Design a protein with these regions (language model features):
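A structural supersecondary motif
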Residues: 313-323, 336-389, 408-409
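N-terminal amphipathic/basic-hydrophobic helices that include classical n-h-c signal peptides
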Residues: 1-36
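C-terminal regions of mature proteins
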Residues: 38-52, 253-255, 420-506
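Histidine-acidic residue clusters that define the catalytic metal-binding segment
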Residues: 61-72, 212-252, 273, 286-292, ...
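N- or domain-start disorder-to-order transition segments that initiate the globular core
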Residues: 40-49, 57-91
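M16/MPP (pitrilysin/insulinase) zinc-metallopeptidase core fold and M16-derived inactive scaffolds
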Residues: 88-157, 335-339, 343-362
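Acidic/histidine-enriched segments that form metal/cofactor-coordinating
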Residues: 38-60, 98, 124-125, 129-246, ...
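An aromatic/glycine/proline-enriched structural segment found at the starts
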Residues: 61-63, 216, 220-232, 248-325, ...
Length: 506
């Protein structure tokens, strides 16, 4: 079992000072780009083209499609069934993606979704915990689940002949879990130990605080595990209420990838999921079912001089999954990339920022990120440095490179970033579990699925002028959220750092 952030790696999620406008309330006008309107038209045309059904490329006659096709059906109760079949695959991944995570909780019930994920493997009305574990082991299958801010996922990987059993097990877990009081008490201690382990991981702690300040007082600002007091107080009624409210057919997608046909999975869905309830007010997948989240320029600093490093995350408001600026923002993030001093010379990397930081010994590592949710996102960078006397230079040169994107990104770095992004996105679809994850996430968040070919076309359509446009829109002279943990005495105050968001010197 695991809980994961929206970038696919394990991620927990916390405040707290709004920044007054002060002298920075008078905005500096960003540099203009004369050809941005033309570029936006070209990109929009490419994105519209990418959403059309893919056409098989053919020179000579062929008896089958060149690429696997994602087939989608909807049952009468609203459950979506999606498959990408590979006829020669001997294994398959099947799973249920639910449009509900910690974002569907309240302050009082925060942590329920993750707690429920833990309880899923503790026995059902048909299978005891031991019988469930033994059945999965005898199949040679892999059964897992994870919770994120916006999704809860239960999936299994098995031999293709065992797909019916795998679907039956997942259905049983979702609809018939016992939620016994004794099991709840045992799992409470497990989750508390898990929370202690996560609190030791500085990166996770910083990103929790970053979400808390950027989306403070709102569902996205809460952690996935929930606060300790909630973990200690969650009861059976809380878990049952969450299931009743969120585990409805119209908010679920049953996904199959690999050795499973669409017709087979539809029949299995009809057999195992037809009795799922429907929301009182069904909302189509990809449509917002909650109020728009507001991004707040603010900061939190947790100084601990016993830590040898400063751990700092800075982020502006990013874009949601369905935004037309999603791929340009991903390309811009790829321009900065990641760097770690322990992995080799910066002279071998393409990022200008990595050269600056390496040559001046400003940081141990950095990681750029573009995290998307259904209606908003976080775009930024995570910095780790033991050069505590030069934290002001570290933030200055980092934000100076950000502002350069509004003025003078180069063709070579944009093209290189596009190639790296395509490689990362497409190579990440290796294996049935990765494909199922991609299908489920896209359908839940946007109501559709971009094929690998459509993704490649959308990335290829991003130009230098498009990078300038999104940089001017999302970076230039914008408020940011900042979270710092560790030896951060040398970190300048918010307003001083904020001035670098509109510097004409690069």
């Amino acid at each position: 079992m695991e809980y994961r952030g929206e970038e696919g790696r394990p991620r927990l999620e916390v405040g707290l000072r709004d920044i007054p406008n002060g002298p920075l309330s008078q905005k500096t006008r960003p540099p203009s780009s004369s050809s941005s309107m033309v570029t936006r038209t070209v990109l929009s045309r490419a994105l519209r083209s990418a959403t059309r059904s893919p056409r098989a490329l053919r020179g000579f006659a062929t008896a089958h499609n060149a690429y696997p096709i994602t087939e989608i059906s909807t049952l009468p109760n609203g459950l979506t069934v999606a498959t990408e079949s590979h006829p020669h695959a001997q294994t398959a991944t099947v799973g249920v993606w639910i449009d509900a995570g910690s974002r569907a909780e309240t302050d009082k019930t925060n942590g329920t979704a993750h707690f429920l994920e833990h309880m899923a493997f503790k026995g059902t009305n048909r299978r005891s915990q031991h019988a469930l574990e033994l059945e999965v082991e005898n199949l040679g299958a892999h059964l897992n689940a994870y919770t994120s801010r916006e999704q809860t996922v239960y999936y299994a990987k098995s031999f293709r002949k065992d797909v019916p059993v795998a679907v039956d097990i997942i259905s049983d877990i979702l609809q018939n879990s016992k939620l016994e009081t004794s099991a709840i008490e045992r799992e409470r201690d497990v989750i508390l130990r898990e929370q202690q382990e996560v609190d030791k991981q500085l990166e996770e702690v910083v990103f929790d605080h970053l979400h808390a300040v950027a989306f403070q007082g709102q569902p996205l600002g809460r952690t996935i595990l929930g606060p300790k007091e909630n973990i200690l107080s969650i009861k059976q009624d809380d878990l049952s209420s969450y299931i009743k409210t969120n585990y409805t057919a119209d908010r679920m997608v049953l996904v199959g990838a690999g050795g499973v046909t669409h017709s087979e999975l539809v029949k299995l869905a009809e057999k195992n999921f037809s009795s799922l309830p429907v929301s009182s007010n069904p909302i189509p997948l990809g449509r917002l079912s909650h109020p728009k989240t507001a991004f707040i320029g603010s900061e939190v600093r947790i100084r601990d001089d016993d830590l040898p490093t400063a751990n700092i995350a800075i982020a502006v408001e990013g874009v949601g999954w369905s935004s037309p600026d999603y791929f340009p923002m991903m390309v811009m993030q790829s321009i900065f990339g990641n760097w770690d001093r322990s992995l080799g010379s910066a002279s071998l990397t393409s990022s200008r920022l990595s050269h600056i930081i390496s040559e001046n010994n400003l940081a141990n590592s950095f990681m750029s990120f573009s995290t998307s949710y259904s209606d908003t996102g976080l775009w930024g960078i995570y910095l780790v440095s033991e050069n505590l006397m030069n934290l002001d230079d570290l933030t200055h040169f980092t934000l100076r490179e950000w502002t350069r994107m509004s003025i003078a990104p180069t063709i070579s770095e944009v093209e290189r970033a596009k190639s790296q992004l395509k490689a990362g996105l497409l190579l990440g679809l290796d294996g049935t579990t990765a494909i199922a994850e991609d299908i489920g996430r896209q359908l839940v968040t946007s109501g559709r699925r971009f094929t690998p070919q459509q993704i490649e076309s959308a990335v290829d359509a991003v130009t230098v002028d498009e990078i300038k446009r999104v940089a001017q829109k999302y970076l230039w002279d914008k408020d940011f959220a900042l979270a710092g943990v560790g030896s951060i005495e040398g970190l300048l105050d918010y307003n001083r750092i904020r001035t670098d968001m509109s510097s004409m010197i690069y």
